[in-house]
Swiss-Prot record:
UniProt family annotation: Belongs to the triosephosphate isomerase family.
Localization per record: Cytoplasm
EC annotation from Swiss-Prot or TrEMBL: 5.3.1.1
Function, in words: Involved in the gluconeogenesis. Catalyzes stereospecifically the conversion of dihydroxyacetone phosphate (DHAP) to D-glyceraldehyde-3-phosphate (G3P).
Protein name in UniProt: Triosephosphate isomerase
Length: 256
């Protein structure tokens, strides 16, 4: 049975005070909660502080990051490597987010190379896929998702998805307040799983597929009730301890 994962992407938000307060608040809210893995991806500058805060609290919260480079060292100004992330305890690394694809011109092929390098370094890629509003309106949702997935599958084999996480995030629902219905999200998740199953039913059966896009405490239960939605990649609601914990609790309850 797939184990649900709820991950908070803090994006470009935070301060030293906020990191400590939010993580301590999460630890308190999640006390006694089992059956769900909870992860956070703070901005790179705060990963060290987040690790120290979680370690001091004896927390089970998983530490992640929002990006990684294709190199472990060298003349690559402004980048951070998988080796550096590992040294600070970050294990779950978001790649392929639509904001990286759009604002940093990251192609499917480039994201696939990041995926391979993270796996090579023993880290867990959280591979974001999803379509724009125009692509959604044109009925191209699954074609886009398949293309983004196949950039990994066709270069590394479907087995590369073992132990990784896929996050389906329709771009038109990220930070907009608009969200795909639970039924629509389930339909796409099922199609994503079926696409993977064309190469390996075993990998498809076991891979965790999160939904992302304006997930809130008010709609989380409906998403997690769907059989192919295995958690969430959460943006805005992850910046509030009570809201994020409520989403994690909904996942634990639905998948028990």
């Amino acid at each position: 049975m797939r184990h649900p994962v709820v991950m908070g992407n803090w994006k470009l938000n935070g301060s030293k005070e906020m990191v400590v307060d939010l993580l301590n608040g999460l630890n308190a809210e999640l006390e006694g909660v089992t059956g769900v893995d909870v992860a956070v991806a703070p901005p790179a500058l705060f990963i060290d502080l987040a690790e120290r805060t979680l370690t001091e609290a004896g927390s089970a919260i998983i530490l992640g990051a929002q990006n990684s480079d294709l190199n472990n060292s060298g003349a690559f100004t402004g980048d951070m490597s998988p080796a550096m992330l590992k040294e600070f305890g970050a294990t779950h690394i978001i790649i392929g987010h639509s904001e990286r694809r759009e604002y940093h011109n990251e192609s499917d092929e480039f994201v696939a190379k990041k995926f391979a390098f993270l796996k090579e370094n023993g880290l867990t890629p959280v591979l974001c896929i999803g379509e724009s509003d125009a692509q959604n309106e044109a009925g191209e949702t699954m074609a886009v998702c398949a293309r983004q997935l196949d950039a990994v599958i066709n270069t590394q084999g479907v087995e590369a998805l073992e132990g990784a996480i896929i996050a389906y995030e329709p771009i038109w629902a990220i930070g907009t307040g608009k969200a795909a219905t639970a039924e629509d999200a389930q339909r796409i998740h099922a199609q994503i799983r079926a696409h993977i199953a064309e190469k390996s039913e075993e990998v498809a059966k076991n891979v965790v597929i999160q939904y992302g896009g304006s997930v809130k405490p008010e709609n989380a239960e409906a998403y997690f009730a769907q059989p192919d939605i295995d958690g969430a990649l959460v943006g805005g609601a992850a910046l509030d301890a009570k809201s994020f914990a409520a989403i994690a609790k909904a996942a634990a309850k639905a998948k028990a």
